[in-house]
Amino acid sequence: MEKKLVIIDGSSLLYRAFYALPPTMTSPDGIPTNAVYGFLRMLLGLYRDLDPEYMAVPYDKDRHTFRTEMYEGYKATRKPAPDELVPQFDLIRDVMQVMGVAVDCLGGDEGDDIVGTLSLRYENEMPVNIVTGDRDALQLSSSRTTVFLTQKGITNMAAMTPEAVFEKYHIEPRQVIDMKALM
């Protein structure tokens, strides 16, 4: 049986879990845990459904990236992470490490850049599944890479193969960049 790699856009899914579940979930010492709980529910469902041999969870470390070096206005209007979410990034990183899941949050790179790099690096060696809420990732869909787009809540996802991308948007995955530039 061929080995599989699942790459989870950690920032995308942690934000989705944070907003999908009530902020009343906390640890005994008062640290919010709603995003961690929702993220782990998604992760365990992915393990069950996709049965990967390898899993990686890249996420954004900070707002300072090579893109902000090139253009100060890059994502300048984006609000910072809510205070209740910030400590959950470290919690989820710790849980992933205990579970043996590769966690990558390199400074200077965005999580979705790492998702793309890993996908292109490994798709010739094994099937790759990307899990994200970021439609920009559709450009990575190929005969060896399926992009699972999160939909409503924390458990519904759409498997976006090249055929599914074409059926929904009437473009090839390689044209996603052009479509986004025109929007």
Where are these regions (language model features)?
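Non-catalytic, usually N-terminal nucleic-acid engagement modules in DNA/RNA processing proteins
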Residues: 1-60, 66-67
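Glycine-rich loop at the start of a catalytic domain that most often binds anionic cofactors/ligands
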Residues: 68-73
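Extended two-metal-dependent nuclease catalytic cores across DNA- and RNA-processing enzymes
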Residues: 2, 23-26, 76-183
